[in-house]
Amino acid sequence: MEVGYSNTVVLRHVKQALENLLAGNVCLTEGVREIAQWRWANHGLNEALFRPFVGVDSETDSFPVGRLRELWSEDGLARADAERVAAEGRYREWILESGGIMLDAVVAALPTSTFTDPASS
């Protein structure tokens, strides 16, 4: 099932998040979270493309990433990072494959995307 219309701004955000994840610019956990947050936005993509990211986000939601890490003790971070790295190892191949498939879908959708909802015209 497709969600909403193909909004150019949303697709650009999803594309950037996918490119960052696939290039290794962010850890797998952070990349998955960035992608999963767009699942209900107007992207016009098949919602099934988001399922791997939503699932792994759910499995890794206890791990601190980004600015949240500043609030953790060194010992706590060391333990959480060891667990996170192990979890990311289990999901890496699946997520990178899913990311490539989703990026292809985003790139294909961008040329026909719009900045406004065509139904509101």
Where are these regions (language model features)?
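Acidic, Ser/Pro/Thr-rich low-complexity regulatory regions
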Residues: 1-121
